[in-house]
Structures are given as C-alpha cells and as structure tokens.
Regions:
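A contiguous, well-structured pocket-lining segment that forms one wall/lid of small-molecule binding clefts
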Residues: 191-265, 271-282, 286-288, 307-314
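Short beta-strand-loop/turn "lid" adjacent to the catalytic site in phosphate-handling enzymes
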Residues: 60-99, 103
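Short glycine-rich, Thr/Ser-proximal phosphate-binding strand/loop in the N-terminal lobe
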Residues: 10-49, 157-163, 289
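Glycine-rich beta-strand-to-loop/alpha-helix junction loops that act as flexible
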Residues: 76-79, 142, 266-274
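Glycine-rich phosphate-binding/hydrolytic loop that grips phosphoryl groups
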Residues: 118-122, 290-314
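Conserved phosphate-binding catalytic cores of ATP/NTP-utilizing and phosphoryl-transfer enzymes
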Residues: 1-2, 107-137, 304-305
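A short helix-loop
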Residues: 2, 9-10, 27-28, 130-134, ...
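Short, well-ordered amphipathic alpha-helical segments that serve as non-catalytic structural scaffolds
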Residues: 31, 50-66, 248-252
C-alpha cells in the first residue's frame, strides 16, 4: 500500500486529496463553501453545515477519479496552527470523517495544522520537498492568516513553524476580499480583483505601515474607500490594494533578513496565487511559490505529510 488520503475542511473550502507516493502523483477535489452575494465571510456554524454536506460529495468525486485505492494512512487538518488555543469548529468536520476512515481501514491517522498543509502543498507543487530538511522562511498569506514563520525540521511533526512576523490587524486576504466586495465583486474576491487590476496602468509608490517585522493592513481598506469616493477607476483601486499587500510582505521579509539572513523563502496561501505577487517575489528573491491549484486551501499538503510521517514511523 502506498496511497495516502488527505482531508481539509477550512473556513472556505472542502478538500480531499490522494497522494500516490511511489509515483509522486497527487489527485485532489475541492469545493468552495457558498457565501451570499455582498457578504464578507461565513459563520462557523454555517461552515460546519456546508462541510458536512459537501465532504461526502468531494470524497465520492475523488475516488471516482482515482478508482479503488489501498490507503496506507489518513492525514487531516485539525486546527489553523499548531499552537495552544488555535481552534476553529469547521475543522471538526474533517476530523470526524478522517477518524471514521482511519478506524474502518485500520490505518494510522495523522493530524497536521492547516498552515503545515499549506507549506507542504507549496513545496510539493514547486518540486522542493527537500526544503523540509533545512531551515527556511515560509509566508502563509490568506484570508485568515498573514504570517512569516521560521520553519525548522522536526522529527515529531515534520514541520516546526515559529511565527517571526505577522499582520497586527487585517489579514491580506481580508483586505482583498473587503476591497473586492466594496467594488461589487464576488466573495472570495481574489481572482476577480486580480483580473480587474490588470486593466490598470497606474503606478503607485506605497510605503507599508510597519512595526519591526509586523505590518498593518487596515489602512489599505480605508484608503481604497477614500479612492472610491474620489471616483478613482475601479481597476486602479484594485491595483492599489494588491500593490499595498506586496509592499507589506516585502517590508516583512526585509525586516527579517538582518536576523535570519538569506534563507530560502516559500509562499503559500490563497493570496499568493496572484500573478503580480508571485512575479514580484520570484524576480526579487527567487522565492518558491505553490502552483495555483495548490495555493488556495487544499488537502494536498496533509496527504503528502501523511506519506512522510508514515515512512518515518514504519
């Protein structure tokens, strides 16, 4: 047996994946949770309900795609981060399903944080899993998180992630979604905001709001509101929002370099699927990015991590 099932039930996406270890092939299915037009998020009770409805459908689609599999182990996201007090009810849906599969098949169940899954998915899709054997800086940039973590190899959990920089208020994905909704785009607004920004030729010189290595993004939403009342083109507002996120992330990394040096830098999370963000940091720092299918929330990382954990514990 050499197939590994990953499950992730994050705040906005129901995901499942199968990792074929010998062939390094990963197949996945995922489905966004429904968010009403004009809303800026979803309540946890609604997220749990929709995951409960969608997860069986996702797993059914996955196994119709892969055919019958001999599952060696199951990996699941249990919390946003591997920190005491890190908790969201939406992950309970995935834990319940993963536990049932594990017990029914008499195979191991491994628990990973949602953040660890993002990092592993980025490394897998970029062909850089060897970085798990050395220190590196990982940015996790999404609607729920805007953090830089120092990642060190860990014998027990594979990934040891220490937060070294973060946003002190609004997260990058929140800023993008709020500005997107402000511009009458659908939630989550990232893809539509990116397409809108590509229509702009504006050039902005943006100074990020920083305190040491931490950034503040609340001013981005306020500035975009002001631009809208001043009748700026919506495409220019969209570009300003994205460039403000770039400036903040760049400020965070620059502040970390004197202490940690030029460690490899990895970007994960839905926000990092933005082509402008990817091109900026790849060109400037040779940063490692997840492929678009592995940037947004997914179960690929937990499937890959469960394979690594299984091999370690043989």
């Amino acid at each position: 047996m050499s197939d590994f099932l990953g499950i992730d039930t994050s705040n906005y996406t129901t995901s499942a994946a199968i990792y074929e270890s010998p062939h390094n092939v990963l197949l996945q299915e995922k489905m966004l949770l429904p968010v009403k037009k004009g809303e800026k998020g979803i309540r946890q009770s609604d997220a749990v309900f929709h995951h409960t409805v969608q997860l069986p459908e996702i797993i059914d689609k996955l196994f119709k795609k892969t055919g019958k599999r001999d599952i060696s182990a199951v990996g699941v996201s249990y919390a946003p981060r591997r920190l005491e007090g890190s908790y969201m009810p939406c992950f309970l849906t995935g834990i319940s399903a993963a536990t049932a599969v594990s017990r029914a098949l008499s195979v191991p169940l491994y628990r990973f944080s949602h953040q660890e899954g993002h990092i592993a998915a980025a490394l897998y899709s970029a062909g850089r899993l060897e970085l798990l054997n050395e220190p590196f800086i990982a940015f996790h940039v999404s609607g729920g998180t805007t953090e830089a973590v120092l990642v060190n190899p860990d014998n027990e959990h594979i990934i040891n992630a220490e937060i070294v920089a973060s946003s002190s208020d609004l997260k990058a994905g929140q800023a993008i979604d709020r500005v997107g909704v402000m511009l009458s785009l659908n939630f989550p607004a990232g893809p539509e905001l990116e397409r809108l920004s590509e229509k702009s030729n504006a050039v902005f010189k943006i100074k990020p709001s920083m305190k040491n290595a931490d950034c503040s993004l609340s001013g981005v939403e306020n500035k975009c509101k002001k631009m809208l009342t001043e009748n700026y083109e919506k495409s220019d507002i969209a570009l300003f929002c994205i460039d403000s996120v770039i400036a903040a992330l760049d400020g965070m990394y620059k502040a970390l370099m004197p202490k940690y040096g030029a460690l490899p830098v990895v970007f994960s999370g839905g926000v990092t699927s933005n082509k402008r963000i990817k091109n900026y940091f790849h060109d400037k720092y040779n940063a490692v990015f997840a492929e678009p299918a592995f940037s947004a929330d997914n179960a690929a990382g937990t499937a890959v991590l469960s394979s690594i954990m299984y091999d370690r514990r043989k």
